[in-house]
Every structure is written in C-alpha cells, then in structure tokens.
C-alpha cells in the first residue's frame, strides 16, 4: 500500500530532530531546472504568481537563491519533519519510532511542486512552490506539464519495490492532478472525510486536512497492508459510513460536537 499526501506551506527547521537518518531526493536534476526558472522571478513577480504578501515573496526569492544541489543535514532536513501544516498536525511524525520511520519510508510519499516525489526521510531545503502555480518552464506552461509522467513513473517504482498495487490517495486534488491514474499500476482508494455542520455532512477543509494526517498515522501505527482495513479508522470521532461509500471512495463521517 502506498499513501500519497500533499506538502505544507508552513515549514519547521528549528524543532529538535527525532531521527538522524536521512535519504536524498531522487529527482533533484528536475528540481534544479525549476530553481533555475524560479530564480528569474523578482519578488513582485513571485508575489503575483503565488498570491502571497511582499514579505513572503522576499523570503521565497531568498530561498530560491540560497538553494543548492548538495543536500546535507546542515542545510536541509527530512521532509516529513520539515512540513508543518494541518495534515502533518494529524500525522505527528515527530512522535514516530525508528520502526515507524522504516514503515513510512516504504509506504508513504509526499507530492511536491519542486521535488516531484519525496520519501519521508528525504532531505529537503526550504521552498514554496505549489503544484498549481503557472510557472513557465522549458517543458510547458505549468508544473503539471513540467512533471509529465515523471511523478507517476516514480510512484510505479515504489509500488513495484513493495510488490503491491494499491494507492491510498490522501493528497489534495491540486497535487493528485500531477499523477496520471491511467498510467499508475494501482487501484486507487480515496478516503473522504465529512464533518457535520448544522445537521449536514460536508467537507470542512481544516478538519479534512487533519483527518488525512490522522488516517496516514492510523495506517502507519497499525502497519496496514489491505485497503479494507482502513474502514476501522475511528480517530477523533470519525466513523466509516458504508452506505455513502462506493468503489474507490471510502467515506468517513463525524458528528458535530454539541
């Protein structure tokens, strides 16, 4: 089983590391090409392209400038410990044991606009480059055209290495769009998380993102290997709703706290 999650905008390069083990990203030649393109942008252009403040644009221009192809524990940290968004709040990788990291390294991948595909222990230098950004490059008008089949091929390699053919899609639509489902050698299972609000169940972004992290942690902690085992997920009040689920989509609901 291969879990896919999105990266996060919020990064943490200060907290103590809970493991010293690391690997290197496998698509750095591609990353370097994108850095070359990104370095052409001025901070005002970055601000417009990414729809971020002038201050954040300045920070990210500096990150593009400071990025270097030689990754070390001094200038980078493990991706799963560097990302700190809602998904990662649910995942809580900072509490993982070494055995958890072993399982995660084999069974979880983070999709990334700059790095393509990251394994949990891959070193990552700080960046912000969301997959949906229209950054023109030598291969096309945006990052989807830049990555083409590369991300899908890398995921197929990971599936072949573990001798499995199931992908658990816990990534956002923006990021999963970088994967070519018809070329992916896998059955795709998508968990969906609905929260009750005023008597109706719907996707509430903050809760859904955290739930994706909680589901990832549930799979890792319990060393799950079969998609039907996911229906046992019950973290923080969620329950499986078989009636609302269909082939390829597992629906989990949570009642409003009263």
Curated annotation (Swiss-Prot):
Species assigned in the record: Shigella dysenteriae serotype 1 (strain Sd197)
Homology family: Belongs to the UPF0246 family.
InterPro entries, A to Z: YaaA
Source organism, top-level taxon: Bacteria
A cellular component term, taken from the record's GO annotations: cytosol
Any Gene Ontology biological process: response to hydroperoxide
Name of protein: UPF0246 protein YaaA
Pfam families assigned: H2O2_YaaD
Gene: yaaA
NCBIfam families: PRK02101.1-1, PRK02101.1-3
């Amino acid at each position: 089983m291969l879990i896919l999650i999105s990266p996060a905008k919020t990064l943490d390069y200060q907290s103590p590391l809970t493991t010293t083990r690391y690997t290197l990203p496998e698509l750095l030649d591609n990353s370097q090409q994108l850095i070359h393109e990104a370095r052409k942008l001025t901070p005002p252009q970055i601000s417009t392209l990414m729809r971020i403040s002038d201050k954040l644009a300045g920070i990210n221009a500096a990150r593009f400038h400071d990025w270097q192809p030689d990754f070390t524990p001094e200038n980078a940290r493990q991706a799963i410990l560097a990302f700190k968004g809602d998904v990662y709040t649910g995942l809580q990788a900072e509490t993982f044991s070494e055995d958890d990291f072993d399982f995660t390294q084999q069974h979880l991948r983070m999709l990334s606009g700059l790095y393509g595909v990251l394994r949990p222990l891959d070193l990552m230098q700080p960046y912000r480059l969301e997959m949906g950004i229209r950054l023109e490059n030598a291969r096309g008008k945006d990052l989807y055209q830049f990555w083409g089949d590369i991300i899908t091929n890398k995921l197929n390699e990971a599936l072949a290495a573990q001798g499995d053919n199931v992908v658990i899609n816990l990534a956002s639509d923006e990021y999963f769009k970088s994967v070519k489902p018809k070329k992916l050698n896998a059955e795709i299972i998508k968990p969906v998380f609905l929260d009750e609000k005023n008597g109706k169940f719907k996707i509430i972004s903050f809760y859904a993102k955290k739930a994706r992290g909680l589901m990832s942690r549930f799979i890792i902690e319990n060393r799950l290997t079969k998609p039907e085992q996911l229906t046992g997920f019950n973290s923080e009040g969620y329950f499986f709703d078989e009636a609302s689920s269909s082939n390829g989509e597992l629906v989990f609901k949570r009642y409003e706290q009263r």
